[in-house]
Amino acid sequence: MTVSLHARRVARFPLFRATRAAVLSALVAAGAAHAAVLTPEQTTDLYLGTFVNGDVAKAAQFNDAMRPRFDGKDALDVAAIPTLGDTMRDNMIAALLSKMPAKSRAALRAPISASIASYQHVLARSECRATGSTQKPNEYVEGESIATVDFSCRVVDVEPGVKALKEKLGNPRLKTDKARTAFLAAFFSGMAHVYDEAPMGRPVTGQVDLYGTNEKGWLTGSPGDVLSPLVDALLGPIGSAGGEADK
């Protein structure tokens, strides 16, 4: 099954919405950069390598290409890339725990942390590349264009593992905080194993809009856009746990 950007899943599952927002918000400070003379596809490949795979070399390559446009300064904070994963993890854990009853949070911290760590590991293994782009005039900036770049990725396929996990846990009616806590602890612990054991191969597609010209180069102020379809594919099951637990 090919996955593309879809907002309906976000609207359905409040836990997924909170977790997804935590992932993308962590990218704003690190990636609110401007760009120079690369093609739209080359620019996107470097964004993908930097923000999906955490590749510091890609960030440095991006800066080398952009430096002439920025008076010799770096466009991306390369020093922040190695710690970006820690920031994301902390934000995601905090977002998930904030949705839990206060008395359950201590018991859920460890299984939630384990599932997020496994998620980050498989995210970094994703294989992505730009596949093409189209351009149109930017009606808000005279003389500039918007390049919509298509990209494709291969990610781990978590759906079979999630299906098996849900069958194992069943569909209990969770009428007390204790029951809900036990269910969620089992689910998040199970999700860590699902991520660890999931095979690579699920296709995912997405798009990102870049702004600029072929002469000046291209940039985005929203590097999290390259992560959106991968987040949907890999974190959607965590959101579905919220739906089950709310029953």
Report the location of each language-model feature.
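Bacterial N-terminal signal peptides
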Residues: 19-30
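Surface-exposed, charged secondary-structure patches
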Residues: 88-176
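Core segments of small alpha/beta cavity-forming domains
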Residues: 36-114
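Low-complexity, intrinsically disordered terminal/linker segments enriched in charged
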Residues: 161-247
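Sec/Tat signal peptide C-region and signal peptidase I cleavage site
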Residues: 31-35
